[in-house]
Amino acid sequence: MDIHKLTNDNYSLNNSHIHAHDFSLYAEDDLILNEHWKINAGLHFSFFNVQKQTYLSLQPRLSISFQATSNIILKSSFSQMSQCTQLLSTASLAMPSDLWVPVTRHIRPMKSFQYAVGVYYTGIKNWEFSIEGYYKDMYNVLEYKDGESFLGSSHNWEDKVEMGKGRSFGVEFMAQETKYF
């Protein structure tokens, strides 16, 4: 079990100060059903209070592994996540500039749902290979409106951003050599 204690965070944006309190708790367990099947289940609880607005979330995680042969493992997983600080990036300068911003009364936490499946192979001495595909749906993704950035006028930064949906997907390949000394 992992406990993240209550913290007081302060954010300064365009001469305004935002004070936030957060607390999180995470628990997980491995269940071995038999010599082939293994389940890892977890639950993350999050409390975030800012500007007299409280955001609570329960975020489940589940991973299932199947040992197909002595060298091949098949895995699938699901995770639901919520994030109360988001990274705003702008390319309006000659170099990228990033700004971390918290949720507020008007800006909701980003939420995502990720699914993954993969195959892992360990049949060659000191080597592990894997291929994994993933898909992620995201909600309340924050970005600057067209033509806006954190530079310039000092009016409310919340007026310069908009929320939307997003998705990402892909395939990851890995080859890893393990040496024991």
Model-derived features with residue positions:
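Repeated loop/turn-to-beta-strand initiation elements of outer-membrane beta-barrel proteins
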Residues: H36-I39, N71-L74, K125-F129, F181
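Hydrophobic, lipid-facing positions within transmembrane beta-strands of outer-membrane proteins
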Residues: H21-A27, L43, L58-I64, F113-V117, ...
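Transmembrane beta-barrel strands of outer-membrane/channel proteins
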Residues: M1, A41-F47, S76-Q80, D98, ...
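Residue-level signature of outer-membrane beta-barrel architecture
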Residues: D30-L31, F45, L56, F66-Q67, ...
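Outer membrane beta-barrel strand-and-loop segments of large Gram-negative receptors
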Residues: N14-I18, S24, E128-F181
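Surface-exposed extracellular loop regions of Gram-negative outer-membrane beta-barrel proteins
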Residues: H17-K52, S57-R61, S70-Y115, Y135-K160, A175-F181
